[in-house]
A protein has these predicted regions:
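Soluble C-terminal extramembrane regulatory/interaction domains of multi-pass membrane proteins
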Residues: 45-158
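Membrane-proximal, non-transmembrane interface segments of integral membrane proteins
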Residues: 1-62
């Protein structure tokens, strides 16, 4: 009974899910601050896309808290490493002389941002898997019912 009241009061989110969402907000803020600190337009676009993807992942998790368990690697490894790499990029970018090692490291980080963005996009897409199954199932049932009632034209059948 008390657990039900607690869940109702917190929007149906368990303390674990709330903690994930709060930590997620901190990561998003950190990503944004790095983006503000890094002037390069091309790398800034990559970071902006990352912020958008990560924000959507957490929005989807808030709407569907059962997805929180799928974020463990993202929370424990991918996001901390992302923040670390962005911090390193900021430091490298601030150097007055951009020598070969600095340029190579920055390029490597930029390429890794592309990889991370692809991974975050795939993770976001995976969070919609159950929704996609539900939609397909609902459409299939609807088409069957319409066909049984003789309400479906041949052009609408798959």
């Amino acid at each position: 009974r008390m657990r039900e009241e607690e869940l109702k009061r917190t929007g149906g989110l368990t303390p674990e899910v709330r903690a994930i969402l709060e930590k997620g907000s901190e990561y998003i803020e950190s990503i944004r601050k790095s983006n503000d600190a890094i002037p390069g337009e091309e790398v800034s676009e990559k970071i902006y896309r990352m912020e958008l993807l990560v924000r959507r992942i957490f929005q989807q998790t808030e709407a569907h808290p059962e997805n929180a368990r799928d974020l463990r690697k993202m929370m424990d490894y991918y996001l901390p490493m992302t923040v670390k790499l962005l911090g390193a990029y900021e430091e490298l970018d601030r150097q007055p002389v951009q020598g070969e090692n600095i340029l190579n490291s920055k390029k490597e980080i930029e390429d890794t941002l592309d990889t991370l963005n692809s991974a975050f996009a795939k993770l976001l897409d995976n969070l919609f898997e159950d929704t996609a199954w539900d939609v397909s199932s609902d459409i299939s049932v609807l088409q069957t019912m319409l066909a049984q009632e003789g309400l479906m034209e041949d052009g609408l059948k798959k």
